[in-house]
């Protein structure tokens, strides 16, 4: 099953997450199919904290990909900020 979830990057004590479409059996930071966006939890000031390619997200959901609970929350947050 394809899932859309966060893959951690960044440095120690400076987390940065890529929002990726991947097979559910792969490791958290392992191989992925496509990078859909990013989430920067330590963004400050004018820095962008969340970016999601809505067209690719809609495509993956259309073919049956499931969102992780955290990604679902970030999608709702990004939608609210865009409106």
From Swiss-Prot:
Keyword annotations: Ribonucleoprotein, Ribosomal protein
Domain of life: Bacteria
Signal peptide segment: none
One GO molecular-function entry: structural constituent of ribosome
GO cellular component, one term: small ribosomal subunit
Keyword Ribonucleoprotein: yes
One of the GO BP terms on file: translation
Keyword Ribosomal protein belongs to the record: yes
Segments passing through the bilayer: none
InterPro entries: Ribosomal_bS16, Ribosomal_bS16_CS, Ribosomal_bS16_dom_sf
UniProt similarity note: Belongs to the bacterial ribosomal protein bS16 family.
PANTHER family: 30S RIBOSOMAL PROTEIN S16, SMALL RIBOSOMAL SUBUNIT PROTEIN BS16M
The name this protein goes by in its record: Small ribosomal subunit protein bS16
Organism from which the protein derives: Herminiimonas arsenicoxydans
């Amino acid at each position: 099953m394809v899932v859309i979830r966060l893959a951690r990057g960044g440095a120690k004590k400076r987390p940065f997450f890529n929002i990726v479409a991947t097979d559910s059996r792969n490791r958290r930071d392992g191989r992925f199919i496509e990078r859909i966006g990013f989430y920067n939890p330590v963004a400050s000031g004018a820095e962008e904290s969340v970016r999601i390619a809505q067209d690719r997200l809609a495509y993956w959901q259309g073919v049956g990909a499931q969102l992780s609970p955290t990604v679902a929350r970030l999608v709702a947050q990004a939608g609210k900020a865009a409106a």
